[in-house]
Amino acid sequence: KRQVEEMLAEARVSHPELEQVVLRVGTVLGAGLENQITELFHRRRLIAVQGSDSPFVFIWTVDLARILLRAAGEGPAGIFNVCGDGALPVHELAGALGKPVMALPAWVLKAALGIARPLGLSRYGPEQVRFLQYRPVLDNTALKTVFGYTPECSSAETFGLWRKAAGL
């Protein structure tokens, strides 16, 4: 992602006549939508990195579709973080799901995933631990004030809608 944004920044300098809309999208949730993140929510317990809140931000599929339409049409150029208001730490997500959290030290998770992936027991590797440990919390202020779109659903509402649709 960083490399792509650097290339886009270079293009803005070398071709200022071109407009760009860069969307940094949080985790997308919608009815019937399943991905690597939602896979984690279907498990018996949620895994957390000890000492990290592992906050999640979500955007509802309907909101994302509206944002994409605006970006392709009359929306302004710029860089925008796309997510609903608020962030949910993994413990709040677990509470909403009625599931326990197993918090493990980062080194234990890295070691376990380093063994599990080569054995075909996990699709995730040790590099995923940093992703859980340092999840980005996007600020959607520019999306609302500059881009002109306020998501209909907050991160919490989006998660609730997805959870209900997923039967959890």
Where do the model's predicted regions map?
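Amphipathic terminal alpha-helices
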Residues: 142-145, 150-168
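Conserved C-terminal active-site "lid" loop/helix of NAD(P)H-dependent oxidoreductases
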Residues: 61, 89-92, 118-150
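Mid/C-terminal beta-alpha module of Rossmann-like enzyme folds, strongest
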Residues: 67-124, 140, 159-163
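NAD(P)-dependent short-chain dehydrogenase/reductase
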Residues: 11-61
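Residues that recognize and position ribonucleotide moieties
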Residues: 21, 57, 86, 102, ...
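Glycine/proline-rich active-site loop of Rossmann-fold NAD(P)-dependent oxidoreductases
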Residues: 2, 16-18, 29-39, 70-80, ...
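Conserved catalytic Lys-bearing alpha helix of Rossmann-like short-chain dehydrogenase/reductases
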Residues: 1-8, 61
